[in-house]
UniProtKB/Swiss-Prot annotation:
It comes from the Eukaryota. Interacts with CD4. This is Maspardin. Keywords: Cytoplasm, Phosphoprotein. It comes from Bos taurus (Bovine).
Length: 308
């Protein structure tokens, strides 16, 4: 149990990448926690936004791999925000503080929904250059909990955790997926009542994405085809919303493929970011491009051979 937490990779990550805490709101209790790794000269990095149960370090495998290839990667943990507008305003202030004009966003589940809402919120003065949406959704009504969204703040921590755990896989899973679930349960335990209540509120508050505002943004939709908290209908809705999106399909990986299928996820991220190489919106150090592209080509070949 808890293999990931004691793994050499995770310990190396914790000992080499510092966790930063930043306040951008008037309210000092609203603290953004983040890992910022890779070359600082990159002005359009890839930013990871976690699911309800996640902390910034759930993306440690992406940070280690992608920074090794020369990418600048930032993984975030949200402050306590109670509505989407407040989140978007806070995130915009954070990007201003970090002096980042435009960014690429990778959002997992709730993180993906918030990434879309932020792209929508800033559509008149765009801050999002591209989106990778992993196991994500475009309309909170799919959870059938919009009526309870206003009462999460009242619930004790154990009840909130029970709600979140209800979406974790309960059937048989392979050892890597079991390790990923253990790690996410551990991360969930580290969240306080207000953190959890606010995230569940954002996840279930009645809201949907307005696609016409973000239709010009390049999108990759990353989906897993085994057990995940998302229904087939929710996935189909995403495909309809983004008809021109690239699709990255993983046969297995459950709710947390970035932990248990990290090599595949990392490769799909690299394939997505490849289209921006050589532009001012590249997330990679120009001196690293040729070696990285060769590796991506090899990996893509492996994926297409597997699919045949």
């Amino acid at each position: 149990m808890g293999e990931i937490k004691v793994s050499p990779d995770y310990n190396w990550f914790r000992s080499t990448v510092p966790l930063k805490k930043i306040i951008v709101d008037d309210d000092d209790s609203k603290i953004w926690s983040l890992y910022d790794a890779g070359p600082r000269n990159i002005r359009c990095p890839l930013i990871f936004l976690p699911p309800v149960s996640g902390t910034a370090d759930v993306f440690f495998r992406q940070i280690l791999a992608l920074t090794g290839w020369g990418y600048r990667v930032i993984a975030l943990q949200y402050p306590v925000y109670w509505d989407h507008l407040e989140f978007c305003d806070g995130f915009r202030k954070l990007l201003d503080h970090l002096q980042l004009d435009k960014v690429h966003l990778f959002g997992a589940s709730l993180g993906g929904f918030l990434a879309q809402k932020f792209a929508e919120y800033t559509h008149k003065s765009p801050r999002v250059h591209s989106l990778i949406l992993c196991n994500s959704f475009s309309d909170t009504s799919i959870f059938n909990q919009t009526w309870t969204a206003s009462s999460f703040w009242l619930m004790p921590s154990f009840m909130l955790k029970k709600i979140v755990l209800g979406n974790f896989s309960s059937g048989p899973v392979d050892p890597m997926m079991a390790d990923a679930i253990d790690f996410m349960v551990d991360r969930l335990e580290s969240l306080g009542q207000s953190e959890l209540a606010s995230r569940l509120t954002l996840n279930c508050q009645n809201s949907y994405v307005e696609p016409h505002k973000i239709r010009d943004i390049p999108v990759t939709i990353m989906d897993v085809f085994d057990q995940s908290a998302l229904s087939t209908e929710a996935k189909e809705e995403m495909y309809k919303l983004y008809p021109n999106a690239r699709r990255a399909h993983l046969k297995t990986g459950g709710n947390f493929p970035y932990l248990c299928r990290s090599a595949e996820v990392n490769l799909y991220v690299q394939i997505h970011l490849l289209q921006f190489h050589g532009t001012k919106y590249a997330a990679i150090d120009p001196s690293m491009v040729s070696a990285e592209e060769l590796e991506v080509q090899k990996g893509s070949l492996g994926i297409s051979q597997e699919e045949q």
